[in-house]
Amino acid sequence: TSSSGFFFTLMAIGMAVSRLFSGKLVDKGMITQVIQAGLYLVCFCFFGLSACGWLADWNLQATSIAFFTIALLLGIGFGTMFPAYNTLFVNLAPNNQRGTATSTYLTSWDVGIGIGMVIGGYIAEISTFKIAYLSGAILTVISLFYFYGKVSPHFHRFRLR
């Protein structure tokens, strides 16, 4: 439908906008902070998408505004995280393994997105999209804790650049 096309257009705009500032922050060495900000934003957006299901019962116009605002913010969140994660992987690899690090990251990202879509689709099929997005939000919260507890300390301890 036209609304899904508009959703993904806004998401693409958000991704483009995020590149204007996130790259500069990563260049200043704020890699983990940029990733954390992106994770927070994506988590907020998944909770927001879940809430849109309940908001639709109350006010359809407010739901549309929230839905499209979330699209823009989701694009900013993913656009912020994606290149920062790549930089994190590359900065952990020796110079002769940088290509392998990028390839590993991109493969992991694709597999994660694919698995997430299959599981999210299954959850939505047996329950509702509200529950599927709520599940995504909960998994993002778990990933935030994992990033704080394991990934960030490991990166700061073993980074090569």
State where each predicted segment sits.
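Helix-to-loop junctions at the C-terminal end of transmembrane segments
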Residues: 18-31, 124
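Intracellular juxtamembrane helix-capping segments at the cytosolic ends
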Residues: 80-93
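Loop-to-transmembrane helix entry/capping segments in MFS-fold secondary transporters
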Residues: 1-2, 95-105
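A membrane-interface helix-boundary motif in multi-pass transporters
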Residues: 122-140
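Hydrophobic core of transmembrane alpha-helices in multi-pass small-molecule transporters
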Residues: 62-80
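Residue-level signature of mid-helix packing/kink "hotspots" within the transmembrane helices
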Residues: 12-20, 113-114
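Transmembrane alpha-helical segments of major facilitator superfamily
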Residues: 6-15, 109
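Structural signature of the two symmetry-related core transmembrane helices
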Residues: 33-49, 137
